[in-house]
A protein has these predicted regions:
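Polar low-complexity intrinsically disordered regions
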Residues: 1, 28-30, 49, 102
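Core beta-strand elements of the Rossmann-like FAD/NAD(P) dinucleotide-binding domain
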Residues: 2-6
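N-terminal Rossmann-like FAD-binding beta1-loop-alpha1 element of flavoenzymes
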Residues: 8-33
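Conserved N-terminal/central alpha/beta ligand/cofactor-binding core
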Residues: 36-117
Length: 117
């Protein structure tokens, strides 16, 4: 059996896994993505490929209001656990920075939409 050594092994080719792989490659790491299905994209491949990141500069430039307090209330209602509070805040704080990083360092371009297709 042949072996290959990589800096980052990503299990699953959904949006999160592919984003991790892209960032690692941008930062100079060797990456391998393993996906069990014949299609990359995970659930985004069947959901119009949309992501929701409240407070992004892309939405702000398009004049789309997406106040963080409303997003915070929505997430708290959907992920109603004390242990999830830190994760929700991390998402709200870093999500917009991730989109900016990807646009700045790759060919990825995010197109804001007022509503899901």
């Amino acid at each position: 059996m042949d072996t290959e050594e990589v800096d980052l092994l990503v299990i699953g080719g959904g949006v999160a896994g592919l984003t991790a792989a892209l960032v690692a490659a941008i930062e100079g790491l060797s990456v391998m993505v393993c996906e069990k299905t014949g299609q990359l994209g995970g659930t985004a491949a069947s959901s119009a490929g949309t992501v929701w990141v409240p407070g992004s500069s892309q939405s702000q430039r398009a004049g789309l209001a997406d106040p963080l307090e409303g997003a915070r209330r929505y997430l708290a209602a959907e992920i109603d656990t004390d242990s999830g509070a830190d994760l929700r805040e991390a998402f709200l704080a870093t999500g917009p920075r991730v989109l900016d990083y990807l646009e700045r360092h790759s060919d990825v371009v995010f197109a804001p939409a007022a509503r899901h297709p």
